[in-house]
């Protein structure tokens, strides 16, 4: 299995910066080279958007965030890395020169991907000394959320390189689609180009404005495409007779003059101004960053809906998200260091991110419950109740929870949790969790909870196996010597 342990991003604009965010959120350190004087600020803003999106996207345990290192040269950036992603402006001489420089300085086995939207990989690798490890890795914006990457080899690209690239992107939650033959603009951008040309004609000829055109897409076939694509959508349109009936019914339409996309619209100053003015009105004063955040929230919602599709197995991008989360849970594993049961167990360290706060900048109620849940999950991993254990059919279910809010958690605040076992037996675990401010140690919230060991298939409680009880025993013995926590046993409305 090919994995990326360290990456380099050459070019840190919209695409390059988002690649860097995707790598970093997968726990990969990233070297960045971009001569733009504000590259660090730009990439920092992209990273902030990405962290906010991931905070909404998944509750699976993400690895520690990879570190950004801004380098002074391409040579410095590519030294010792596994994957190099080139994302410089779309000009063949510039890209070819940058790729040649990467080729000369990179490790012989390092993978070199280009984010080009349409240039042929054979043209990009023409002057390389090691062209066999170079390929197109064409993503879609925002790279940190949209999982697709088109993998396109050139004439000199080895099949082994494409295989390694496909494995590597899967490990960071992406869907590597291998394009069988190289062609300008590959697959996705050729489809987008056709749609874009027709859209420009519709605006040019005053058939509609930009908002009307976007409404037609987002309230209709755009929703279908997000979950079934083009051909599967049309298969359904053919009814019980399927695709062949659809083609027989609508095939003759191809000879009708319904489109103008084979003609190139004259994108003159007047049309540019027309589209620009309509787009400004459509944005209604929202900044690009605001629109990006709205886009990201909507994409997260779509992926969550797709994750629940096909009877809970996941569908399309949602199934990919479910598979990625499964790997994250498996990698979360048990803590690498032994835990000291002479005091409450410190199990989770985190920071309040933008996805966790309300309009007041305070952490929302359900995020407190999420953090308590993350802590109980961490305890279960300590005693051997990991993903494989759950997949085998047994688990612990939470049956009772009492939360107290004693303070406020705010955006950017560092937090940690501690857990104290109150009692346990072969079926039950009764425990008390505190959320602390990392700087002062003050307790912000507490939760007293009870979990039952269950046979998930039978739908009933059953005794935990001996190996789980053996791991729970030293914690129970250590915590039996501790004073009862303040607040344990309280109920709602209880007088002090």
Curated annotation (Swiss-Prot):
Pfam families: 3HCDH (PF00725), 3HCDH_N (PF02737), 4HBT_2 (PF13279). Keywords: Cytoplasm, Hydrolase, Multifunctional enzyme, NAD, Oxidoreductase. GO terms for molecular function: carnitine 3-dehydrogenase activity; hydrolase activity; NAD+ binding. Disulfide bonds: none annotated. Residues 1-335 are annotated as: L-carnitine dehydrogenase. It catalyses: carnitine + NAD(+) = 3-dehydrocarnitine + NADH + H(+); N,N,N-trimethylglycyl-CoA + H2O = glycine betaine + CoA + H(+). GO terms for biological process: carnitine metabolic process; catabolic process; fatty acid metabolic process. Pathway: Amine and polyamine metabolism; carnitine metabolism. GO terms for cellular component: cytoplasm. The keyword 4Fe-4S does not apply. The keyword Amino-acid biosynthesis does not apply. Homodimer. NCBIfam families: PRK07531.1. HAMAP family: L_carnitine_dehydrog. In the N-terminal section; belongs to the 3-hydroxyacyl-CoA dehydrogenase family. L-carnitine dehydrogenase subfamily. This is L-carnitine dehydrogenase/betainyl-CoA thioesterase. It comes from Rhizobium meliloti (strain 1021). The gene is bcoE-bcoF.
């Amino acid at each position: 299995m090919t994995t990326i342990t360290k990456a380099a991003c050459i070019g840190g604009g919209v695409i390059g910066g988002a690649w860097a965010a995707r790598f970093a959120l997968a726990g990969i350190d990233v070297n960045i080279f971009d001569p733009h004087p504000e590259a660090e600020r730009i990439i920092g803003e992209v990273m902030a958007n990405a962290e906010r999106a991931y905070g909404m996207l998944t509750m699976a345990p993400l690895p520690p965030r990879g570190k950004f290192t801004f380098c002074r040269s391409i040579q410095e950036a590519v030294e010792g890395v596994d994957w190099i992603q080139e994302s410089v402006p779309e000009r063949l001489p510039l890209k070819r020169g940058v790729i040649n420089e990467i080729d000369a300085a990179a490790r012989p086995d390092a993978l070199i991907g280009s984010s080009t939207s349409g240039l042929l990989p054979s043209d990009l690798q023409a002057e390389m000394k090691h062209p066999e490890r170079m390929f197109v890795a064409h993503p879609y914006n925002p790279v940190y959320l949209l999982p697709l990457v088109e993998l396109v080899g050139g004439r000199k690209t080895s099949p082994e390189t494409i295989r390694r690239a496909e494995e590597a992107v899967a490990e960071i939650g992406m869907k590597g689609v291998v394009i069988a033959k190289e062609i300008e603009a590959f697959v996705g951008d050729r489809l987008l180009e056709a749609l874009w040309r027709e859209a420009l004609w519709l605006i040019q000829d005053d058939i509609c404005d930009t908002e009307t055109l976007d409404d037609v897409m987002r309230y209709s076939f755009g929703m279908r495409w997000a979950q079934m694509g083009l051909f599967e959508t049309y298969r359904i349109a053919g009814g019980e007779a399927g695709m062949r009936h659809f083609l027989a019914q609508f095939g003759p339409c191809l000879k009708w003059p319904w489109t103008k996309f084979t003609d190139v619209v004259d994108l003159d100053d007047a049309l540019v101004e027309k589209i620009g003015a309509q787009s400004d009105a459509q944005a209604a004063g929202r900044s690009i960053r605001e629109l990006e955040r709205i886009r990201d929230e909507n994409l997260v919602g779509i992926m969550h809906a797709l994750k629940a599709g096909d009877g809970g197995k996941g569908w399309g991008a949602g199934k990919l998200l479910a598979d990625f989360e499964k790997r994250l849970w498996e990698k979360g594993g048990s803590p690498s260091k032994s835990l000291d049961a002479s005091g409450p167990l410190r199990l989770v360290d985190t920071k309040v991110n933008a996805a966790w706060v309300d309009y007041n900048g305070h952490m929302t109620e359900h995020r407190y419950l999420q953090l308590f849940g993350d802590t109980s999950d961490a305890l279960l991993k300590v005693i051997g109740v990991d993903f494989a254990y759950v997949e085998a059919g047994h688990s612990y279910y939470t049956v009772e929870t009492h939360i107290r809010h004693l303070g406020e958690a705010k955006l950017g605040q560092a937090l940690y949790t501690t857990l104290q076992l109150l009692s346990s037996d072969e079926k039950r675990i009764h425990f008390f969790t505190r959320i602390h401010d990392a700087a002062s140690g003050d307790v912000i919230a507490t939760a007293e909870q009870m979990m039952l060991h269950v046979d998930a298939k039978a739908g009933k409680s059953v005794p935990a196996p001996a190996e789980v009880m053996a791991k729970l025993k030293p914690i129970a013995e250590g915590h039996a010597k501790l004073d009862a926590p303040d607040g344990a046993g309280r109920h709602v409305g209880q007088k002090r």
